[in-house]
Amino acid sequence: MFFSTNELQHKDTLAIGLFQKSQLSGKAKEMDELLEGRITELLKEGDISSKRNQLSKFFPSPETGIKRIYFVGLGKESDYTFEEAKEGFAHLFRKLHQDKKQAVSVLLDTFIGKDLPAQDAAHTLSESCLLATYELQDFKHKTNEPDRFIEFVYAMTDHDTTEIQASLKVGEVYGQSVNSARTLVNMPPNMLTSSDLASYAAELAYKYEFEIEILDKEQMEELGMGGILAVNRGSTEPPKLIVLKYQGKEEWTDVIGLVGKGITYDTGGYSLKPRASMIGMKTDMGGSASVLGAMEIIGELRPEQNVIAVIASTDNMISADAMKPDDVIVSLSGKTIEVLNTDAEGRLVLADGVTYAKQHGASVLIDVATLTGGVIVALGNETTGVMTNNDELYAQFKEASEECGEMIWQLPITEKDKKRVRNSKMADLNNSPGRDGHAIMAGAFIGEFAENTPWVHLDIAGTATTEKPSCFGPTGATGVMVRSLATFVERFEGKK
């Protein structure tokens, strides 16, 4: 789909980036000369714009052999970064998709800035193309014409085409993997059960030669996974603990544990959600989708790291045998938990998932979950809440998230917070100390199972979905943290 070339391969549709500056330069200047100064004229007359994210279209004279040119405003070069480039490309490809263009030649060198080298621009191009042209998979009876997608993108450059092609490939892998996660999260809950999620993971394992283990209910009972089993009690769908192992080193050391919450539907259980809050709870497996998306990138790019991915999956339903407030359960770790809120179920399955990852060699842990409404109140829908017990590990993850443009913000876990989750007359822990500090209480609870293992907790409740369409696609799932997790794995520095 993406091709690097030193020559103009497709003249029907061209795309050129324009910085706000007094004079054109580089490839933009060369194209202006080919068009006998028309770009300069159009800029002066205001018919095309170099302001950031402004798109303009121009139809040259037939003798040039070029049918149409899309101009992408990039703003001031001094303000131009990876994120600005990503938005510019996204606006371009979304417009091309809407115009049903199937091929385009992009003058890549016009999108290069002093802080954005050619390889980064190429990565951004392919990643943004796939994110921007993603369409929600629906189940309507279609009678309209079939969708037409962009099939050929030629990145024309004076740089080494082999290096540019490699960067295009990495960006393509990142974009496709994010879209895979989006599709999982958008699926209706009757079409994505825990068994379906396990089947999807098995397909990944087969494709990328991961070691895979899928624990069923009987195996969980033998091991004593009281957290997952308690949440599953109200369901007719069997639970699954999905384990993928990728070994990129000779020895199984410095193992990164990725743990995803896989609640395929959440009614709240007997602590029942109101109707309005229940709609959309198919997305409560967003953490598992982020982990699987990251594993797709890992499988494609094969970093020299060791990774164990653990997904604890069930739905949270109601029946005569369902988990009740006041129940006391025994987790895989042996710690007992007093259930004060059956709608605080995600932390129960994560407790067993985290413990299982530790038991199977994880030396550091990152858990990902659509866990609390509290994090949305605190941070909104653009920033993922983060908690940790290890500043060095957090710093490594923060660097990865910044590189990917995914905003995070650290919330504290104090000794008083830990005391609140340990406050129970009946058990070692309680699963819901109260509404105040809700997001922190959830993180503190999971931290009781991470114990001394370096650990980062990502609460993506606010960022896993969006209600506003953007240049990066429609409403629905965002695939948040897929790129950050994969980048963290690639850059991870273990014990020194």
Swiss-Prot record:
Gene Ontology biological-process entries: proteolysis
Main location (coarse class): cytoplasm
Binding site for Mn(2+) 1: D266, D343, E345
Active-site residues, record numbering mapped to chain: K273, R347
GO molecular function: manganese ion binding; metalloaminopeptidase activity
The protein's enzyme class: hydrolase
Keywords: Aminopeptidase, Cytoplasm, Hydrolase, Manganese, Metal-binding, Protease
Disulfide bond sites: none
Subcellular localization: Cytoplasm
Pfam families, per the entry: Peptidase_M17, Peptidase_M17_N
Domain of life: Bacteria
InterPro entries, A to Z: Leucine_aapep/pepB (IPR011356), Macro_dom-like (IPR043472), Peptidase_M17_C (IPR000819), Peptidase_M17_leu_NH2_pept (IPR023042), Peptidase_M17_N (IPR008283)
Cofactor: Mn(2+)
One term under GO cellular component: cytoplasm
Record family assignment: Belongs to the peptidase M17 family.
Protein name, UniProt field: Probable cytosol aminopeptidase
Native species: Bacillus pumilus (strain SAFR-032)
Record gene name: pepA
